């Protein structure tokens, strides 16, 4: 018996449009990973059996604690069980079909029963997209993605295998997800808005509606025991072909605030976020508003050179491996291990220096450890009035 699944408006539209390139800039808790990324990955792995795709995350830690839990939780609700329909981090069982291009190693690979694979590509792990031949890409938390690395290392790998999947509109497809960036470097994906052809998107919307009407007519004929005319079947096939062609050239760009998911979040969530977050973070991460960068502030003077990633890959790999080996382990258990041990810049034997900043509207504490002429800020806290 079919199971009803709820999707909000942004989630439904993204799936129905099905553009080859989709860029969704949406506020927190709009279900980007759960109900936009998860259907995208599942669709590609199902429609292109034996293909290989890439899930690009800014850091491996982020992938373990944010992206993968959202994907797996959604798949589980839809009946896809880890250990039965897919495995992660190990060679798939012999009952699974083989990938067209089998991975050299399966350490950070999701393997589906039909031979499809998804490689976890983390930008803080050098060379994680080397020598890959990919048929699709999911780019999560795009505002934290280094575009130069993506452009030079990963996008060229999204060449796919045209001889197998050339007829599919989802071949070479790209899904980019993020909330609104606050920095110029993190804004690299906003230009896709100018690449979207509104007429193509409108034509896709019209075809989706026409196909739905045709399917409803065919359904009515079958329920009444009448023979379905060949004209209806031909029309359905013709429109399906048109839809596939338009989707294969389409770029879809949309911006949504968290209010789009108000039915599930409730008004209290929005009020709480306005109270707890800084005004800038609330504007970008909840309301999804584009902002200018202030020129007279201290933080706007900080450059990309002031930022760094310091993941302890050996520790994270051990945590991930313990999860990969046990299909019954929930990913939430990983979060309990994500403390200072996952940070390579933390010296457990050195003192921690604390700095405080008392302000009229917000109080800060930052904790760091000096290292020569460098100060590694390992944690920050704030409270608003």
PLM features per residue range, with description:
Residues 28, 122-124, 176-182:
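A short beta-strand-to-loop transition that corresponds to the Sensor-1 phosphate-sensing loop
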Residues 140-142:
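Walker B catalytic acidic pair
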Residues 144-264:
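ASCE P-loop NTPase helicase motor core
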Residues 2-19:
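Pre-Walker A adenine-sensing motif
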Residues 23-91:
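Conserved P-loop
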């Amino acid at each position: 018996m079919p199971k009803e699944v709820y999707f909000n408006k942004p989630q439904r539209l993204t799936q129905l449009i099905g553009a080859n390139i989709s860029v969704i800039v949406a506020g927190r808790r709009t279900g980007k990973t759960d109900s936009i990324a998860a259907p995208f990955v599942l669709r590609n792995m199902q429609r292109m059996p034996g293909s290989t795709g890439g899930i690009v995350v800014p850091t491996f830690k982020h992938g373990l604690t944010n992206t993968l839990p959202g994907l797996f939780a959604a798949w589980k609700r839809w009946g896809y069980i880890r250990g039965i329909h897919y495995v992660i981090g190990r060679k798939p069982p012999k009952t699974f079909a083989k990938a067209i291009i089998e991975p050299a190693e399966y350490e950070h690979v999701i393997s589906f029963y039909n031979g499809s694979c998804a490689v976890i590509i983390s930008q803080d792990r050098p060379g994680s997209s080397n020598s890959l031949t990919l048929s699709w890409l999911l780019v999560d938390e795009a505002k934290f993605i280094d575009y130069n690395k993506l452009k030079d290392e990963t996008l060229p790998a999204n060449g796919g295998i045209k001889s197998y999947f050339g007829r599919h509109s989802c071949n070479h497809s790209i899904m980019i997800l993020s909330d609104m960036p606050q920095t110029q470097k993190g804004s690299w994906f906003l230009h896709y808005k100018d690449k979207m052809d509104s007429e193509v998107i409108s034509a896709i919307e019209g075809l989706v509606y026409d196909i739905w009407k045709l399917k409803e007519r065919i359904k009515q004929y079958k329920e009444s025991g009448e023979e379905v005319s060949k004209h209806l079947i031909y029309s359905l096939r013709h429109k399906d072909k048109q839809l596939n062609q338009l989707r294969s050239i389409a770029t879809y760009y949309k911006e949504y605030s968290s209010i789009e998911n108000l039915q599930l979040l409730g008004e209290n969530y929005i009020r709480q976020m306005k109270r707890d977050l800084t005004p800038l973070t609330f504007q970008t991460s909840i309301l999804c508003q584009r902002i200018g960068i202030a020129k007279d502030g201290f933080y706007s003077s900080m450059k990309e050179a002031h930022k760094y990633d310091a993941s302890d890959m050996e520790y994270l790999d051990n945590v991930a491996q313990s999860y990969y080996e046990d299909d019954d382990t929930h990913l939430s258990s990983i979060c309990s291990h994500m403390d200072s041990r996952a940070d390579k810049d933390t010296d457990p034997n050195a003192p921690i220096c604390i700095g405080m900043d008392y302000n009229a509207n917000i109080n800060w504490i930052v904790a760091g450890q000096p290292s020569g002429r460098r100060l590694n800020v390992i944690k920050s806290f704030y409270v608003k009035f």
